[in-house]
Amino acid sequence: MHNSPLYAAIDLGSNSFHMLVVREVAGALRTVTKVKRKVRLAAGLDPEFRLSRAAMERGWDCLRLFSEQLQDIPSDNIRVVGTATLRLATNVDEFLSEAERVLNHSIEIISGEEEAKTIYEGVSWTSAGEGNRLVIDIGGASTELVIGEHSEAKLLNSLHMGCVTWLNNHFGDGELSEARFQQAIAAAKTVLEKVAEDYRALGWRTCVGASGTVQALQEIMLAQGKSERVTLPKLQELMGQAIACGRLDRLQLEGLAAERLTVFPSGLAILIAIFETLNIESMTLAGGALREGLIYGLLGNNHDCDARDRTADSLISRYQLDKEHAERVRDTAVEAFNQLQPAWRLSKRYGRPILRYAALLHEIGLCIEYKKAPQHAAYIIDNIDMPGFTPAQKKLLSALLFNQRDEFKLDTLEKQGAVTGRQAIRLARILRIALILCMRRTQGTVPSFTLQAEEESLTLTLPKGWMDEHYLRASELRLEVERQQKIGWPTRVQEA
């Protein structure tokens, strides 16, 4: 089997150094290696912005680890960049001289504007969204704010505040109090006010976060049984939980990983300031950021389609799915969704896209075997990289595939976090009916149909005489009616 070439991106961040190694497979990126080491470079800056010898040593030690992985990758396929702390350091040349020797590769110190632009590039490739999108990336020593649409960044700024610098400035002695948080929030608002009006004037439809702070928040939300969308009340609730712990060395929040503890309060304070200053309603986690932007820059790919569409197309190709049949199921499921949306108040923004992808990928489990194909499909989705899909969207997709036939497994639908459990169940009911109507797998064999609903009651109307002429699908529909009625959902099939 011919392997495509490897590509590597290294981000010398203010808090951590990251290395991402990928290869392109079936039109999508497959992660080969991902390494992160906490270097705390920003903590080594003195008042004159000189990097301490100890901080530089931590950086060089990390790069020695990375250098081994780079030996077998063509130099043209590697990009290494330094960000905020290295932009600030007055003795950066001393650090770079040894760092480039260790890596055997040149290192670029990119401007704040280029960093923001590259972050947006990574987000646009790995996260779905229509209309203007606000991207927030809270780094160790800088915070990038970008508004863009599709692949075009329209407004961008790199601000001099980050989770490491705010930790040192406002939580340096480890005290977690209301006063300390308010002090940190107020300081962040002072920085934000210089640019806030431009962002409010341009506006956005969706907001995504591309930093470790937002990753930590989403992990906490899901661990605590909340939806994945970050809101100001949720942030304020977490601030209250942190204050109740009293000190940084006693900080314990359900779902917060140990390696994120130290900089979590400072990142949280900055994010609260951003939410309050820009009047943000909600935010989700981006699929990628700076490193992914560097990789896509190396590849030179275009931005002609939605990130989730690219992922679905790649999976269809990789697992050799019947694309024509998958698209027929998708069209049938979407038609059913559109008919039921007003009565069931289904989410066009959050529910319909995932139903589409469930229809397109419903046969992915067949690559293992038929009998337990729904379980296999769910397992694959749970354990594969899917650029463009948030963790909760992946869980919903997995739950729909798990429930595509046989008995319902309601717990998977109720615990996914992307939409309400009730909506997820209704999406599963739609998918199952669409799959039965498309069983012939041939163009022109899907009947015209009407679906009507009142609360959980569902009626499918087919052309007169259709059931007598299509024995197998009629039998499957009757079995499906029995399954749904057994749970307490009145369901019937009629002809007219």
Question: In which residue ranges do the predicted regions lie?
Answer:
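Beta-strand initiation motifs
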Residues: G27-V32, E152-K154
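Conserved beta-strand/loop subsegment of P-loop NTPase cores
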Residues: N77-V80
